[in-house]
């Protein structure tokens, strides 16, 4: 059963808020970054990737964020517009802040890493005064991403967006998106992630991300069931815990659980899997699919993206996912 109820009389399906950055993916693979000579530029950032994926699948999508007042900022905004994402609430930073950069290293399909430049980034300068209540109430759903909670004023902007969402019955998706390099300590991270999760209808994260959120609780032993049940005492209706190549498990407040598998593919790199999974899973739920069907879409989308060089450019259409699912071997 799909427990989510969306307000159907709204012009936007999904609004994402948070990180907008640039990915520079290594063109030379099977080697360390020290030996990489060229990179290809893509729009990046977890909420940006999810918004792009959702738009490719047919959802009417918008974004609340902030970009640098330079060529990189204009590149990001232009790319989102080209992908039919409403950019009315993407603000331009006037303080001299820059666009975050993510350099990727692809030594092998199993050995990929990211080198991040996140000092003085524009996306974390999003101010609460730049979060429009009128804009949020036009949407059926809001996606927040954990990285936007790392610093003020972005942190307060996200919590204000959450308040507006609850006021206007906007379904909230929380993609945990834990990036240690943006935080001062695990304790600080856990506090703000827990506060955001308490106000979310759907929480999506890896087992490791949920472990981080539980560090302050001093659990002697935790498991997926215990983790999920903790959130059902708050707003959560669905908790998805991802286990990489072992698939994912979705828990619902009525006590049910659903296991999602993966689709066999030729893996080029591992990053981008979570964002593509989230975009297709959210799309499926918003189309009224049952949770197992939405999870299959997510798994197929993830397998497509990890077989390609980019994350944002590789986000598939609904037709591409359907064609892939017809031929690829599903591993449950």
From Swiss-Prot:
Please give the pathway this protein is involved in: Polyol metabolism; myo-inositol degradation into acetyl-CoA; acetyl-CoA from myo-inositol: step 5/7
Q: What is its EC number?
A: 2.7.1.92
Q: Which UniProt keywords apply?
A: ATP-binding, Kinase, Nucleotide-binding, Transferase
Record GO biological process = inositol catabolic process
Q: Name one GO molecular function term.
A: ATP binding
Catalytic reaction annotation: 5-dehydro-2-deoxy-D-gluconate + ATP = 6-phospho-5-dehydro-2-deoxy-D-gluconate + ADP + H(+)
Superkingdom as given in the UniProt entry:
Bacteria
A Pfam match: PfkB
Q: Which residues form the signal peptide?
A: none
Q: Which InterPro entries match?
A: Carboh/pur_kinase_PfkB_CS, DKG_kinase_firmi, Myo_inos_IolC, Myo_inos_IolC-like_sf, PfkB_Carbo_kinase, PfkB_dom, Ribokinase-like
**Primary role:** Catalyzes the phosphorylation of 5-dehydro-2-deoxy-D-gluconate (2-deoxy-5-keto-D-gluconate or DKG) to 6-phospho-5-dehydro-2-deoxy-D-gluconate (DKGP).
HAMAP family recorded: IolC (MF_01668)
The family note in this entry says:
Belongs to the carbohydrate kinase PfkB family.
Q: What is this protein called?
A: 5-dehydro-2-deoxygluconokinase
| Taxonomic path | Bacteria, Bacillati, Bacillota, Bacilli, Bacillales
Q: Which gene encodes it?
A: iolC
């Amino acid at each position: 059963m799909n427990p989510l109820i969306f307000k159907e009389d709204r012009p936007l399906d999904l609004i994402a808020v948070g990180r907008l950055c640039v990915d520079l993916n290594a063109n030379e693979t099977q080697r360390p970054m020290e030996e990489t000579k060229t990179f290809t530029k893509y729009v990046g950032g977890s909420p940006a990737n999810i918004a792009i994926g959702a738009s490719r699948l047919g959802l009417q999508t918008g974004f609340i964020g902030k970009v640098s007042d330079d060529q990189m900022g204009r590149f990001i905004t232009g790319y989102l517009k080209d992908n039919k994402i409403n950019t009315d609430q993407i603000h331009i930073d006037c303080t001299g802040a820059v666009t975050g950069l993510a350099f990727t290293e692809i030594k092998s399909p199993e050995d990929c890493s990211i080198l991040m430049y996140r000092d003085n980034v524009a996306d974390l300068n999003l101010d609460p005064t730049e979060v429009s209540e009128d804009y949020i109430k036009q949407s059926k759903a809001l996606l927040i991403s954990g990285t936007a909670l790392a610093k003020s004023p972005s942190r307060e902007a996200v919590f204000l967006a959450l308040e507006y969402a609850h006021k206007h019955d906007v379904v909230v998706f929380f993609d945990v998106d834990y990036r240690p390099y943006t935080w001062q300590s695990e304790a600080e991270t856990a506090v703000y992630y827990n506060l955001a999760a308490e106000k979310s209808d759907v929480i999506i994260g890896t087992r490791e991300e949920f472990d981080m959120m539980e560090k302050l609780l001093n659990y002697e032993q935790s498991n997926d069931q215990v983790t999920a049940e903790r959130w059902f005492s708050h707003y959560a209706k669905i908790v998805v815990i991802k286990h990489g190549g072992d698939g994912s498990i979705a828990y619902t407040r009525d006590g049910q659980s659903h296991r999602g598998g993966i689709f066999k593919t030729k893996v080029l790199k591992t990053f981008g899997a979570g964002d593509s999974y989230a975009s297709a899973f959210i799309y499926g739920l918003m189309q009224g699919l049952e949770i197992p069907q939405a999870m299959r879409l997510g798994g197929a989308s993830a397998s497509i993206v990890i077989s390609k060089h980019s994350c944002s450019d590789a986000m598939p259409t609904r037709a591409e996912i359907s064609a892939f699912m017809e031929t690829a071997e599903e591993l449950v």
